[in-house]
Amino acid sequence: MMEPEEYRERGKEMVDYICQYLTTVRERRVTPDVRPGYLRAQLPESAPMEPDSWDSIFGDIERIIMPGVVHWQSPHMHAYYPALTSWPSLLGDMLADAINCLGFTWASSPACTELEMNVMDWLAKMLGLPEHFLHHHPGSQGGGVLQSTVSESTLIALLAARKNKILEMKASEPEADESFLNARLVAYASDQAHSSVEKAGLISLVKMKFLPVDENFSLRGEALQKAIKEDRERGLVPIFVCATLGTTGVCAFDCLSELGPICAREGLWLHIDAAYAGTAFLCPEFRGFLKGIEYADSFTFNPSKWMMVHFDCTGFWVKDKYKLQQTFSVDPVYLRHADSGVATDFMHWQIPLSRRFRSIKLWFVIRSFGVKNLQAHVRHGTEMAKYFESLVRNDPFFEIPAKRHLGLVVFRLKGPNCLTESVLKEIAKAGRLFLIPATIQDKLIIRFTVTSQFTTRDDILRDWNLIQDAATLILSQHCTSQPSPQGANLILQTRGPRALAKEMSFPSVNGAGDDPAHSRKIVMQPPRVGASPVSRHLETLLDPLDDCFSEEAPDVTEHKLSSFLFSYLSVQNKRKAVRSLSCNSVPVSAQKQLTTEGSVKNGSSSRVRIFSRFPEEVMMLKKSAFKKLIKFYSVPNFPECSSQCGLQLPCCPLQAMV
């Protein structure tokens, strides 16, 4: 058994281990290489009858536990949203765990209750929340409380809204059964809302409707008003709206300035879920998303995500605490105390009875960092995300289908979903960074969140190179797996590729570049000077894409083949064969060496694009022949180019280009 002196010694040993772990976590593989049930074989069937030595227990941390850990504090952890910790936060919980009070009432631990009330007022002011969310403000009937999760906070808000509405309905229908009234209730959220909102509806037995969002993935007032009108006509009673600030998928923001007035007019409880983005409101420049917050009946966010206060720690504020207390109040004799009518008892603000002393770690973090350093932390994470966004935008093989907000960038490989899925699987094999998918508008996307306070530009560049290398491998495999077109013999072998290439040009209109919106107009036919053998053969082929091309032929600048093809195929949606235009002039056998010696060390991508070698000279082919150049199929393997590109017939003799 451990005695105080041994605890002192072992405690120092554990602090040293924690310091070593957190300062070197970037060197560890982010995700574990284990299978479900890996731990079972390493533990005895039954608990030990006699005590183990601490040395044995401590040794099993690295032997048994760490091989199965996902390292959430790693700068290379980009999945989900942050779950950060910090030295002051760890110290705070060390003390709170030693005190180990159960602060269900003021009398059970006055310091636990009163520190929480004051720290929640601090935090509300730091975020710029309305004064009606403060405990200590003249005329305020609201206040804040720490919950375990945002999921729990959303459920609590919905239960409070349900109770309040049922009491109103019983005033006019006193004989009605509460279960009958409950069956008529309906609540709303956007179709981008977190899964916990749906779960809250299931638990409370309130119908939860998920409303469509606009092009920016934001829930707007028009959609809400329409749903309310339709449901009232059906005899339903709308009671609750959950607006999300910073959705899980793409970090989109619902429009509070439109939703708020509707909720106030229609008598709906407006709850704000800002689980991740709430920390950003420490910075005044991000508070534009809070426009309309004065209409909110409740607001919740997680300091345990981005604010460096480790899990669990969720802030939850209500405008009217009495509506909350009437939902959860119980009054057994053994919980009463002399100051019950005067003091705040947080057991009436939550589902459980007992509660941890969470406010100590939050207090330690706010005091140790100060508001300015917490703001700097948020701005640093946002700048790192901007840097990653710039890297993605500069690569023509990727696209960003939704606007970046704060520290989250969503991106995907151009082409079908299977390519993006394959890239994720390839990245997961190595475990050197952790990414997860999401879907928007039937597109599979990759979420890249800057999670660590220690992330540097070098970390971002290193991870981007790993993503590029995985994409290069998947694209080359995808291309080489496609059959060569049987019409290749239509290209006369006597006409060399260099001669053919001299007649090829791909114009760009008004500097449109890679913008797909301009792609329908960039395939133009220059005046015909003479017919070559190649063009005569191509003209004999069927031309199913005649309606896709413009007849205009303005005098425009030249444009590289790769950029043109990506833009054209994106607009035309011709993605049924080879989904990639990846070309690599290095044999597959040499790609591994190139990846190791090139991309990681010097910070540049290992991809060598054959398209960059294409001559940009005038092509004298008829429109129908020209279209054959961009048919989206694979080409045969070349002696020095084991990867294949997305050109059809005219590309077959291009092997001499490499």
Swiss-Prot record:
Record pathway: Amine and polyamine biosynthesis; histamine biosynthesis; histamine from L-histidine: step 1/1
InterPro entries: Aromatic_deC, PyrdxlP-dep_de-COase, PyrdxlP-dep_Trfase, PyrdxlP-dep_Trfase_major, PyrdxlP-dep_Trfase_small, Pyridoxal-P_BS
Modified residues (N6-(pyridoxal phosphate)lysine): 305
Biological process annotations from GO: catecholamine biosynthetic process; histamine biosynthetic process; L-histidine catabolic process
Gene3D superfamilies: Aspartate Aminotransferase, domain 1 (3.90.1150.10), dopa decarboxylase, N-terminal domain (1.20.1340.10), Type I PLP-dependent aspartate aminotransferase-like (Major domain) (3.40.640.10)
Domain of life: Eukaryota
Protein's UniProt keywords contain Lyase: yes
A GO CC annotation given for this chain: cytoplasm
Residues annotated as binding substrate: 81, 194
Cofactor (UniProt): pyridoxal 5'-phosphate
GO molecular function terms attached to this record: histidine decarboxylase activity; pyridoxal phosphate binding
Record keywords, A-Z: Catecholamine biosynthesis, Decarboxylase, Lyase, Pyridoxal phosphate
Catalyzed chemical reaction(s): L-histidine + H(+) = histamine + CO2
Transmembrane as UniProt keyword: no
EC number of the protein: 4.1.1.22
Family: Belongs to the group II decarboxylase family.
Described purpose of this protein according to its UniProt entry: Catalyzes the biosynthesis of histamine from histidine.
Quaternary data: Homodimer.
Protein name: Histidine decarboxylase
Organism of origin: Bos taurus (Bovine)
